[in-house]
Amino acid sequence: MATELKTKNKIHPQKMYLYAGLGSIVMMFAGLTSAYIVKKSQSNWLDFELPKVFIISTVVILLSSFTIQMAVKKAKEGLQNPYRGFLSVTAILGVVFMLLQYKGFMMLQANNIALTGPKSNSAASFLFVITILHLLHVLGGVIAIFGVRFKSLSAKNNPENTLPVELLSTYWHFVDILWIYLFVFLHWIG
């Protein structure tokens, strides 16, 4: 009688760590957006319109979701050059997103909407804190993309191990979805 080994569909420990980290990020942004809603009801709240450049940055980050997914696909197919190319394009789109966000901040400041100082108000402070925290997470993702990209060039690289790009893709899609949520929240609720 042959012994049958039952294999369970287990989640890789690194994926569990990632999910736990993403959960904590969700809680942080849920707290910030909840505080935003509460604070908005106060009399000193100043409503203002988001710069149109935030719409462009939203399109850019959505495109980056496509390119990171293509990187995963090419990695699983064992096509290293296209894989590296899609990683590079994703990183470039991430940098473009950050630059567009910065441009949006400069447009806000040009319209006398500032984070600190005599021109500051609660609405602007919340906007800047929420978007800057998101930008830091995008920056972390861009750094991770470059790390995975350069590791793929290493002689020790195992092309069959797609876990790094899968983890990266999960994080990147999360950051993209988080921005969509924040953009919709700030645009329609803000």
Feature-to-residue mapping (PLM):
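...captures the hydrophobic TM-helix bundle architecture rather than a specific catalytic motif
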Residues: M1-G190
